């Protein structure tokens, strides 16, 4: 900045500082003349500086003690001194008490009424000389470069008090607000607006559609409802299951819409509430016990019970007392294959995409090819019946009536080696479960023992059941166990505390499973009970509210069950496998979602 411009800037600053406070607040033309002012304002700057030395104090106050412009701490500026003078750059600014009180009263009234937090000064008639000097100041200002304007405004704002900062903030705030969703497409950045809105949930997305036509266009053109449904399918197993069962999963994760001639987003917009309706129906059916029932009869000349099972979307694999493993088609309920080789009852099994592993009362563990049905390996270690087994991530744990637990390393189906034998139970070990941290075992000796998965060292014992323990499941910190004392107990594995005791079964609790919402148990009384898991973990929940529903269809002891969000599959001593479907008959409830111009086929299976 050259010397001439510096002089002009100094004069303009002196002029601005010499104006009464109320005129500062009315002079908005300076901000209007320089757009860069809108991005400079910082409410954190200080207030006016008063009385730099003692001589200024004497000059300004005629020998009297200085009078404060800024009130004491915690004051609301209720009063000001009758006549206060500030010395700023050797210029005197007179602030009358009348003007200050008027401004303060207007501010209080606005805040009390809740209409606005902006302080509005009392209107006053501006003199002709002021108008002339203001125009001259603006003229000087416009002659400067943008950097000089910025420097001047920064210095000017630093001379103001918080009262003036508040008014400037109220003036600038509307200028700084921008509708970015509307502005981005106008600059060819539609994809950024769509990406921002794609993080909204359904309720917020509905609200966004109603903001204006441009927001509605962005949500429609961006296929945001499709992206929302795809996100839910990726993260939620219930949504994944519905996509498969209802058939609308075929329209997801594809760039091409179901019908290129129809408004594509309308299909997914209509589909979303349909999915929510299905989810609400499922939850209601679980609580009310409404279900459709399918029955597989496994009875044969030698069969006297179905001891174990596991299922997926295509098949059910069952282990029977007649020494066989039967694989059933889940759609047709027909037996597709029978695996033979065990010389005793098949008491436990588990399978993945490659192998089926079974344990038997013949004390052996056998490995089968899941697709071909061929026996790949036979493990002989236990000296009595193998009661339960689990395998995952190259590791398998088996337990036996011989009171021992065997830990195996699985390099391949044909290369399985014994790593460690865990001994500590005083009766048959009925069930095991494990993850990367703990191995958990339960026994007829009434105890649950916890072992370190990596070192196989003993960690702790969970005591509480009054009789032998027949079943358990372990996940995260929670262990749920069932016993021949007819109770179910919930445990915190880290501290060993019993969190809740569930009572309701009349005989031994033989099988139990849980997910994030519910516990499902089966017992020798032939009943299957559904419990509210979240309520069971709440110590304030009354015991009478924990059992949601009791299902009675089996005519014999319930040996094993498995469930997901839609169904329970159970097996019993009555030689049947029951499929309890809580979505009911999908074809009876399916309706095609409609778009404004087309009708789509809503597929059900």
From Swiss-Prot:
Pathway: Protein modification; protein ubiquitination. It comes from Mus musculus (Mouse). Homodimer. Self-associates. Component of the SCF(BTRC) complex, composed of SKP1, CUL1 and BTRC. Direct interaction with SKP1 with SKP1 occurs via the F-box domain. Interacts with phosphorylated ubiquitination substrates SMAD3 and SMAD4. Interacts with phosphorylated ubiquitination substrates CTNNB1, NFKBIA, NFKBIB, NFKBIE, NFKB1/nuclear factor NF-kappa-B p105 subunit, ATF4, CDC25A, DLG1, FBXO5 and SNAI1; the interaction requires the phosphorylation of the 2 serine residues in the substrate destruction motif D-S-G-X(2,3,4)-S. Binds UBQLN1. Interacts with CDC34 and UBE2R2. It is found in: Cytoplasm; Nucleus. Residues 190-228 are annotated as: Required for down-regulation of SNAI1. GO terms for molecular function: beta-catenin binding; protein dimerization activity; protein phosphorylated amino acid binding; ubiquitin ligase activator activity; ubiquitin protein ligase activity; ubiquitin-like ligase-substrate adaptor activity; ubiquitin-protein transferase activity. The N-terminal D domain mediates homodimerization. Keywords: Biological rhythms, Cytoplasm, Nucleus, Repeat, Ubl conjugation, Ubl conjugation pathway, WD repeat, Wnt signaling pathway. It comes from the Eukaryota. Disruption phenotype: Mutants have normal circadian behavior with normal PER2 expression in the suprachiasmatic nucleus. This is F-box/WD repeat-containing protein 1A.
